Every structure is written in C-alpha cells, then in structure tokens.
C-alpha cells in the first residue's frame, strides 16, 4: 500500500525561520507562493527582471527578486520553471547559491530523474507535487481544504528532507486531502506516460481520428465536432466524478453496449503493445533525450507539428461552434 500523509503527519515548524524561494509565477507558482505566505511562511518569488509576472506577484503582496537573488536568500528553493529550461537556469542561476544544508525541490521530477540537473551531495532534494492545476490548489486552500499531492525524497543530506517536504505540502494545503509517498522515478515516468499515451497524445489523436472518419464518410463537420469533441466533456466529467462505472451508469444502454463491444476494437492489443513501447522509451530515456535535443536546436520539429495541428479542420469548425456557446469563457 502507498503511504499517505495528512495534516497530523506534517509540521510547519520545519519551515519556520527559513526563506522559501519559489522560482516561477505561473499556474503552480502563484498558487504555491500565495498559499505558503498565507500559512505564515517567509516566501520570495524568483523571476527574470523583465518578466511580465513581476508586477503581478508584487500586486499579490509577495516579495519578488531575480532568480539568483532569491536563491541567495533562501534555504529552500522550489523550481517551478518549464522542464526544458530548468537545466540551464539551474547551472547559471541556482547552483552557485546552493550551499551546504539547503533544500532543492521540484513539483515534477523530469530533470532530476533524467540527469539534466545533478545537485551537490550536501543538499536535500525532494519533490512536492499537487495533483491539480494551480488555480484549484489556490481555491481549495482559500476554502480551508486541499488537493491531493505527491511527496518524494531524492537526497536526504540533513536527515530532515521528508519533514521539510511534508511541511511544504501542508503549507499549500495538500495534507488536508492526503499526500502520497512516491519516488522521482515513479512520478516522472507515470506523468509522462499519462500525458503521451492517454491525456494529451492519446485523446487528441482519438478525437481527430473520429472527426476525420465521419467527415471523410460525408457527414457534416459540425456533427462530427459535436459527437467526437464537444460531448467528450460530458463523459469525462462523469468519469472524473465517479470513475468508469459512474459514466456507464449514466449513459444509455445503447452507449454502454457500444462501449463494451467496440471499445476493445479501437484500443486493441496492437494499441496496448504500442503503449508498452512508449513506456519503455520513457523508462530508457529515449523520450527525454529527444526532447532535450529538440530544444537545443530551437525546436524545429516541435514548432512545425504545432503549426500543422493548429491548421487541422477541427480547429476552424470548433472556433465557429464555440461562438454559439455563451457559457464558454472567451
């Protein structure tokens, strides 16, 4: 069984008297920094001097400094920067200030697990990862609740790494819901697999394949959009609220029968074998190497595919139909 930690297992005293640098002020950065501050902890946000978010963080009542200045001040450094720039920023702006006994932490294990960042042996290294987007982390904290999270220790120099990590998790509200103990390897590899095979890559290709199949067969693109993309939210919401069983209970018997009989023809053994291959390429570092190499040459393949995907007919049809949906945020 996975070990789960709650409020009673965590003590904010392990962070009292320590300065916490939160590097980045995006989705997770703003939520974590504000919640830590509201938990009575000493926080500084680290940003580029020319960052558009500098004034936003100041307006939110937070101390802001450049990344090197924030790291120089802090005993705990939380790196909430995009995966592809963390290695460079670490080498240039974090490592010079990572003195003995400090703590280096992350909310995703990519750069530690794949060796893009190799911290000195005389610091703590751990991970605290809320399992929700930043706006929900912040909202739940403000309501006196929390979202589930993960905690992992990569390096325990001081003997207090897990205590500090759990204190941080408590400071952002996660221990109210429960914090699951994991490892950098498990967090990183499962996160990447979920994104690639299911949540992003898998779902995107399934939607487009369904849309294309209907349009190629002569059906109206608008009908194809409704059936293969728009209604997905209705199904996902049911799954999110109560699992696959809730969804199957809520749909018609015809839909449920089609689920059981046809689903395995779409995701068949060939698909499952390809998923196993995708996982192997994550585990052996192939994906990480490809992504790092892509960034080193300014992402030509990434940018070309991104542009091509933006020009898929489903985007034009969807833009028109969403104009007819006043409940959607523009």
Swiss-Prot record:
Claim: Magnesium is one of the keywords in the record: yes
Annotated substrate binding sites: 252
Cofactor note: Binds 2 magnesium ions per subunit.
Ranges where the KARI C-terminal knotted domain occurs: 183-328
Any single Pfam family the record assigns to this protein: KARI_N
SUPFAM superfamilies in alphabetical order: 6-phosphogluconate dehydrogenase C-terminal domain-like (SSF48179), NAD(P)-binding Rossmann-fold domains (SSF51735)
All copies of domain KARI N-terminal Rossmann, residue ranges: 2-182
Alphabetic keyword roster: Amino-acid biosynthesis, Branched-chain amino acid biosynthesis, Magnesium, Metal-binding, NADP, Oxidoreductase
InterPro entries found in the cross-reference section: 6-PGluconate_DH-like_C_sf (IPR008927), KARI (IPR013023), KARI_C (IPR000506), KARI_N (IPR013116), KARI_prok (IPR014359), NAD(P)-bd_dom_sf (IPR036291)
EC number from the UniProt entry: 1.1.1.86
Reactions the enzyme catalyzes: (2R)-2,3-dihydroxy-3-methylbutanoate + NADP(+) = (2S)-2-acetolactate + NADPH + H(+); (2R,3R)-2,3-dihydroxy-3-methylpentanoate + NADP(+) = (S)-2-ethyl-2-hydroxy-3-oxobutanoate + NADPH + H(+)
Top-level taxon: Bacteria
Binding site for Mg(2+) 1: 191, 195
GO biological process: isoleucine biosynthetic process; L-valine biosynthetic process
Pathway: Amino-acid biosynthesis; L-isoleucine biosynthesis; L-isoleucine from 2-oxobutanoate: step 2/4; Amino-acid biosynthesis; L-valine biosynthesis; L-valine from pyruvate: step 2/4
Sequence similarity: Belongs to the ketol-acid reductoisomerase family.
HAMAP family, alphabetized: IlvC (MF_00435)
Its biological purpose: Involved in the biosynthesis of branched-chain amino acids (BCAA). Catalyzes an alkyl-migration followed by a ketol-acid reduction of (S)-2-acetolactate (S2AL) to yield (R)-2,3-dihydroxy-isovalerate. In the isomerase reaction, S2AL is rearranged via a Mg-dependent methyl migration to produce 3-hydroxy-3-methyl-2-ketobutyrate (HMKB). In the reductase reaction, this 2-ketoacid undergoes a metal-dependent reduction by NADPH to yield (R)-2,3-dihydroxy-isovalerate.
PANTHER family: KETOL-ACID REDUCTOISOMERASE, MITOCHONDRIAL
Record-given protein name: Ketol-acid reductoisomerase (NADP(+))
């Amino acid at each position: 069984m996975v070990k789960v930690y709650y409020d009673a297992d965590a003590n904010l005293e392990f962070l009292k008297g320590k300065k916490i640098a939160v590097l980045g002020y995006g989705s997770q950065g703003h939520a974590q920094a504000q919640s830590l501050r509201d938990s009575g902890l000493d926080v500084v946000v680290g940003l580029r001097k020319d960052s558009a978010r500098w004034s936003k963080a100041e307006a939110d009542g937070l101390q802001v400094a450049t990344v090197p200045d924030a790291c120089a001040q802090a005993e705990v450094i939380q790196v909430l920067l995009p995966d592809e720039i963390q290695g460079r920023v670490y080498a240039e702006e974090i490592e010079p200030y990572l003195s003995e006994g400090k703590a280096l932490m992350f909310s995703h294990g990519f750069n530690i697990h794949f060796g893009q960042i190799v911290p000195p042996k005389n610091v703590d290294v751990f991970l605290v990862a809320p399992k929700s987007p930043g706006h929900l982390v912040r909202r739940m904290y403000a309501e006196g609740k929390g979202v589930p999270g993960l905690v992992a220790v990569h390096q325990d120099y001081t003997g207090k790494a897990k205590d500090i990590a759990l204190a941080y998790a408590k400071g952002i509200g996660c221990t109210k819901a429960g914090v699951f103990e994991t490892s950098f390897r498990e967090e990183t590899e499962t996160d990447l697999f979920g994104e690639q095979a299911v949540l992003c890559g898998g779902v995107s290709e399934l939607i487009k394949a369904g849309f294309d199949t209907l349009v190629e067969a002569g059906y109206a693109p608008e009908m194809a959009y409704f059936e293969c993309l728009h209604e997905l939210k209705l199904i996902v919401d049911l799954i999110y609220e109560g699992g696959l069983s809730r969804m199957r209970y809520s749909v018609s018997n015809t839909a449920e029968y089609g689920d059981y009989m046809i689903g395995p023809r779409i995701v068949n053994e060939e698909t499952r074998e390809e998923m196993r291959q995708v996982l192997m390429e994550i585990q052996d570092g192939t994906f990480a190497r490809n992504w790092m190499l892509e960034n080193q040459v300014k992402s030509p393949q990434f940018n070309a595919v991104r542009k091509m995907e933006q020009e898929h007919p489903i985007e034009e049809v969807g833009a028109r139909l969403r104009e007819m949906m006043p409940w959607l945020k523009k």
